[in-house]
Structure formats: structure tokens, C-alpha cells
Amino acid sequence: MANAQQQVFGGGGGDDAENNDAPQQGSGTQQVNVTGTDDLLDEIDGLLETNAEEFVRSYVQKGGQ
């Protein structure tokens, strides 16, 4: 059998630098969404602590939507 040689080429440094910036920008946007979600969940928790029975009745009347 003949010996096979394999060549491996590395990517250019410029492309890698651009790709590293993109996930960081996306992470910032994702953090904003999580913060909004946390605020909404805190509001729901507060409502349930004060008047859970009314919340459940209103949820059932709307058909769970």
C-alpha cells in the first residue's frame, strides 16, 4: 500500500477575529431578553403571592391562553 499524505490548511487570522466578535454581540442581546423575562416572572410571582386564587380563575376563564 502506498503511504498517503494529508495536508491541513489553517484559516487566516482576519477571518477568526471577525468571527470572535459576532458571538459577543449576540450575547449582549440575549442578556437583555433574559432581563425582561426575569422582570416578567417577578411580576407574576408577586401576583401569585397576593392573589393566586383570582389569577387561576382568570386563567381558566380565558381557556388557558
From Swiss-Prot:
Is modified by deamidation of its C-terminal glutamine to glutamate by the deamidase Dop, a prerequisite to the subsequent pupylation process. One of its GO terms (biological process) is protein pupylation. The modification Deamidated glutamine is found at Q65. Keywords: Isopeptide bond, Ubl conjugation pathway. Belongs to the prokaryotic ubiquitin-like protein family. Strongly interacts with the proteasome-associated ATPase ARC through a hydrophobic interface; the interacting region of Pup lies in its C-terminal half. There is one Pup binding site per ARC hexamer ring. The gene is pup. There is a cross-link at Q65 (Isoglutamyl lysine isopeptide (Gln-Lys) (interchain with K-? in acceptor proteins)). This is Prokaryotic ubiquitin-like protein Pup. Protein modifier that is covalently attached to lysine residues of substrate proteins, thereby targeting them for proteasomal degradation. The tagging system is termed pupylation. Pathway: Protein degradation; proteasomal Pup-dependent pathway. It comes from the Bacteria. The keyword Nucleotide-binding does not apply. Residues 21-59 are annotated as: ARC ATPase binding. Pfam families: Pup. One of its GO terms (molecular function) is protein tag activity. The N-terminal unstructured half of Pup provides a signal required to initiate unfolding and degradation by the proteasome but is not needed for pupylation, while the C-terminal helical half of Pup interacts with ARC to target proteins to the proteasome. Residues 22-34 have a biased composition (Polar residues). Residues 1-38 are annotated as: Disordered. It comes from Corynebacterium urealyticum (strain ATCC 43042 / DSM 7109).
